[in-house]
Amino acid sequence: GALTLFAQLAIAHAQFETIHPYHDGNGRTGRLLLPLLLTAEGYPPLYLSGALLRARSSYYEALASVQLRGEWGPWLQLLSRAVVESCDESIAIARDLVTLVERWEQELGRYRAHSATRRVPRFLIGHPVLSVQQAAEGLGVSQPAANAALNNLLAAGIVSLVSERQWG
């Protein structure tokens, strides 16, 4: 039968690390393959590198177990723990973002419910760095309306100005 996506991830990473194609950066590149493969299959790009590096010695031992003895068990167990840990981290971040947006929306409560000012906070989650033009296009409003909305958020301390040139 076909291999599960988890098995494909485990094999791809272990093979990449075994081949070690570059002089430098193989570990980073190999860990970057994991979220890219997930995304290619339509899944969210879990950031597994952090969890793997927090268990650095176990990570190296598990890969060596595959490379030197063909023993996949330790690597599969470690990778599965990293997936669970990464999912937990992603859920916590998503909850924190929801809480942040709700707080911003409360702070902006004096503005009309469907105004550009009230809609910007949710848009910021997917676009944390943006120009007035990007805000206007994303919110479906004029550039002056987007500029006014961003100025309201600037006054509320929700956004900050990166540079005058980028703002206008």
Give the ranges of each region predicted by the language model.
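Phosphate/pyrophosphate-binding active-site loops
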Residues: 1-95
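Minor-groove-contacting beta-hairpin "wing" of winged helix-turn-helix DNA-binding domains
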Residues: 166-168
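Short acidic, hydrophobic short linear motifs in intrinsically disordered regions
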Residues: 121, 126-139
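Basic amphipathic alpha-helical segments that dock to polyanions
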Residues: 124, 146-156
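A short, conserved structural fragment
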Residues: 154-164
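Short alpha-helical segments that sit at the start of domains
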Residues: 90-121
